[in-house]
């Protein structure tokens, strides 16, 4: 016998479409799904199309007429198929007993849920099923949990603030404990820096005492003044520029000034002769307004500050910079005013 060799002919486009159309159902579904996703990937209807078809199928197969069977009461309490499954899950979770509760509490919950379900074919609702949304449980089941969650951050904030206050008091860089308030003071010390002011009146000192006593955040007298407001000199290395006599002025300024004037002899020199009195007043003002307090013994310059007579110094306000030499800045200011 003679075997004939079969040759495969190329298929036309119509034959290929027929073969694809006669293919299995899974291939067609995959092809349709692929084409749908490629043609319109941003369409939201593509994602919900299958769900809509399932919902229509459930509605078509749902029996809206009540049955006369004894299980009719149970069937009436079932959820409507229009409700989504994920919404019905929290309501079903209420049927299970809680960790701390008992089975009787769970049964009472089911009775309360069943009492809220109405007959879908009642005459009050027009004989149509009511589209009821299933009840969902809140995240916090009791008010005590809400109170505890609100109190915890408050406790954390309070502990953090108290810790900062304690650390600030312990790390204060004062070398001598000073009283909190003193009357008749004409100087203020903020972390080893003197701020000069005019001599206060008796009324002003009493008002300042009352105002400072009324403050709730004032430190006790035994402790030193906190450095939260002033500039910390120990951080910037400014302690070497501060005179050691500042500590003696902090306890009682008036007594320390008298002691300083008695221990250290003062040199009385006449002021430079000048035609106008404005330059002398500007010189004294520039000398008293300088904020640099160099320690004693620094040989910055041999030129001494012009001082007033002893009688005028006792009558006027005390001069704290009388015992030190003039700096280069003060000399340059004096020469600029004199010229």
UniProtKB/Swiss-Prot annotation:
The modification Phosphothreonine is found at residue 159. It comes from the Eukaryota. Residues 136-149, 214-224, 279-293, 302-314 have a biased composition (Low complexity). It comes from Saccharomyces cerevisiae (strain Lalvin EC1118 / Prise de mousse). This is Mitochondrial biogenesis regulation protein 1. The modification Phosphoserine is found at residues 177, 224, 227. Coiled coil: none annotated. Keywords: Mitochondrion, Phosphoprotein, Stress response. Pfam families: MBR1. GO terms for cellular component: mitochondrion. Belongs to the ISF1/MBR1 family. The keyword Ribosomal protein does not apply. Residues 99-115, 198-213 have a biased composition (Polar residues). Residues 1-20, 94-156, 198-224, 258-325 are annotated as: Disordered. Its main location: mitochondrion. It is found in: Mitochondrion. Participates in mitochondrial biogenesis and stress response.
């Amino acid at each position: 016998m003679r075997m004939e060799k079969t040759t495969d002919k190329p298929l036309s486009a119509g034959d290929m479409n027929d073969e694809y159309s006669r293919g299995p159902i899974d291939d067609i579904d995959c092809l349709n799904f692929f084409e749908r996703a490629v043609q319109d990937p941003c369409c939201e209807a593509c994602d919900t199309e299958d769900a809509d078809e399932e919902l229509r199928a459930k509605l078509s197969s749902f029996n809206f007429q009540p049955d006369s069977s004894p299980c009719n009461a149970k069937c009436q309490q079932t959820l409507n198929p229009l409700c989504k499954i994920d919404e019905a899950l929290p309501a079903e979770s209420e049927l299970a007993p809680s960790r701390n509760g008992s089975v009787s509490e769970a049964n009472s919950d089911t009775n309360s849920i069943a009492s809220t379900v109405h007959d879908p074919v009642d005459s009050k609702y027009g004989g149509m099923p009511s589209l009821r949304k299933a009840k969902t449980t809140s995240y916090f089941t009791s008010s005590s949990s809400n109170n505890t969650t609100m109190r915890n951050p408050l406790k954390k904030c309070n502990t953090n603030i108290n810790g900062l206050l304690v650390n600030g008091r312990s790390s204060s860089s004062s070398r001598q404990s000073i009283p909190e308030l003193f009357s008749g003071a004409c100087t203020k010390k903020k972390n080893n820096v003197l701020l000069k002011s005019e001599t206060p009146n008796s009324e002003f000192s009493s008002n300042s005492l009352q105002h400072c006593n009324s403050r709730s955040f004032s430190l006790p007298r035994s402790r030193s003044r906190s450095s939260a407001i002033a500039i910390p000199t120990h951080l910037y290395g400014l302690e070497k520029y501060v005179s050691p006599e500042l500590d003696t002025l902090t306890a009682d300024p008036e007594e320390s000034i008298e002691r300083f004037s008695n221990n250290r002899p003062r040199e009385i020199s006449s002021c430079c002769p000048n035609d106008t009195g404005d330059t002398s007043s500007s010189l004294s003002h520039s000398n008293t307004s300088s904020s640099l307090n160099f320690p004693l013994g620094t040989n910055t310059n041999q030129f001494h500050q012009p001082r007033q007579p002893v009688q005028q110094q006792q009558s006027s306000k005390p001069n704290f910079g009388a015992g030190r030499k003039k700096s280069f800045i003060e000399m340059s200011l004096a020469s600029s005013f004199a010229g």
